[in-house]
Amino acid sequence: MSNAALGAAAASTPLFEVRGLRAAFDGKPVLEIDSLRIPEGGVTVLVGENGSGKTTLLRILNGLLEPAAGSVHFRGLPLAGEGRTAARARSVMVHQLPLLFRGTVGQNVGYGLRIRGVPREEIVDRVAGSLEAVGLPGFAPRRATALSGGEMQRVCLARALALAPEVLLLDEPTANVDPGSRSVVERVVRDRARAGGSVVMSTHAMETAYRLCDTLLRLEAGRVVEPEENILRGAVERTDEQFTRFRAGGALILCPARQGQFRVAVVPMDELILSRTPLDSSARNRLRGTVTAVEQTAGLLRVSIDCGVVLKALVTPSAAVEIGVAVGRDLVVTFKASAVRLY
């Protein structure tokens, strides 16, 4: 398929689409995903405990592991066929445990370029640029075996960046690294997304997930489960002795006072109370909005309310009837400042 055709497919289809996916090790199921769409562009973060299936899913998306059943499509092409070539040509996976060859940092970072026949002068430039991007300028002559764990992880990331992939697949890129390396990795991920690239990464560190994600996918025992928190992007307006005021879209949210330049506010869905009129409550956040969607989930209803920013609340069916929840209905959303966490 031509590059033009691939581009047209990418514009109308998700980056990855999974149907009926099953994977097992030693006869034990490790992935059971009936349907999953990973969007093109931005940062998709897979979260879950160790053993939840995050790494297995990434390896399947990269074509490194064949599922026992089901289908995976990359930009509309089956990964079992023509899509595998397209995916491998446009994506790079960085594994959790850094693997470097003997030799210099520059030789490691330039390895993928050399085997692709890239001219030496271009390799030198791209190696220098990718090392600069991960905060390791001038590291090219150093011995790879003399690096710290955080530096090794950053060199592996630089090796991937040198190939200029459209898609980065990162398995626990911030695990077991120093805070400085963690900040660099997070910056690289954000920069890739801002530049129009796609990043699919895994982590069990929720603070990292909240800071980076455009889409959050939670895995439990190999299954995708719905997130139960509102993840709101915005900025701090001001902080006084009692509260930090966080602006998300058209909503101003009060949080416990914290100093810092936070970009994300997280509010659990089950902390939101819906009512037709303002409640007599000590809760400091009271936002008026309009119901835009009502979905069933595990015996509850997930209600979306546009309050200048869309908030989702979990309510019981009986409470929904009592309140009169319906699409188009105006409601008041109430929650405590202490329910809000900033990242």
Task: Map each language-model feature to its residues.
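Conserved ABC ATPase signature
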Residues: 143-147, 151
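Helix-to-loop junction immediately C-terminal to a conserved catalytic motif
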Residues: 62
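The feature captures the beta-strand-to-loop junction immediately N-terminal to the Walker
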Residues: 47-49
